[in-house]
């Protein structure tokens, strides 16, 4: 497929920053880590059945599934240092959510996060449930429903907003998770949430805009060279 050339280009452009916005290994209290695993599990199980059904009924979509996974891995591995001393990155989740839906992307996103934890030390195994919930579940759901709500009016705008807002809501969810786990001792949860949100806002808003634009370009390329596959998914 011709869009594999685009993926290979991204691979060679990935920066190798050592920090990650994924919640790092051991950072969450054990109880919190377990709760996020439990909340993520139903979405993951449904996603497995969804992928199995998709491959069985439309085996020609296997390559597109693989490309979506590779795109997510590459884009979410781009760690950009923040002026606040933290790091941000795109999520890459919007593309797959638009094409295959949120449940399929829950599985793909979880696999991406697992490989990043094992191979790149981004995130961790104990925090995999929390990172899955924020990026692969919330990000996918937001992207999917934004696209479905707007695509009949203007497809490119729908794609942009889906990827843009899916990215932002991933970080809102991560900030919520951290604020719940570590409320401010004096001012409580709300103050802590505002603090975590402000840490990532400076770099994440521009990154979300870039991710939205990149996703529009990629969708256009897939439409250009593999329109039939997108039609099979109702796009």
Swiss-Prot record:
Biological or metabolic pathway of the protein: Cofactor biosynthesis; adenosylcobalamin biosynthesis
Spans through the membrane: 34-51, 63-83, 95-115, 118-138, 156-176, 199-219
Compartments (UniProt record): Cell inner membrane
Record's keyword terms, sorted: Cell inner membrane, Cell membrane, Cobalamin biosynthesis, Cobalt, Cobalt transport, Ion transport, Membrane, Signal, Transmembrane, Transmembrane helix, Transport
Membrane topology (UniProt): Multi-pass membrane protein
Pfam families associated with the record: CbiM
GO molecular-function terms, A-Z: cobalt ion transmembrane transporter activity
GO biological process: cobalamin biosynthetic process
Gene3D superfamilies registered for this protein in UniProt: 1.10.1760.20
Ion transport among keywords: yes
Cellular component terms (Gene Ontology): ATP-binding cassette (ABC) transporter complex
Signal peptide (UniProt feature, chain positions): 1-33
Assembly description: Forms an energy-coupling factor (ECF) transporter complex composed of an ATP-binding protein (A component, CbiO), a transmembrane protein (T component, CbiQ) and 2 possible substrate-capture proteins (S components, CbiM and CbiN) of unknown stoichimetry.
Function: Part of the energy-coupling factor (ECF) transporter complex CbiMNOQ involved in cobalt import.
NCBIfam families associated with the record: cbiM, PRK08319.1
Name under which the protein is recorded: Cobalt transport protein CbiM
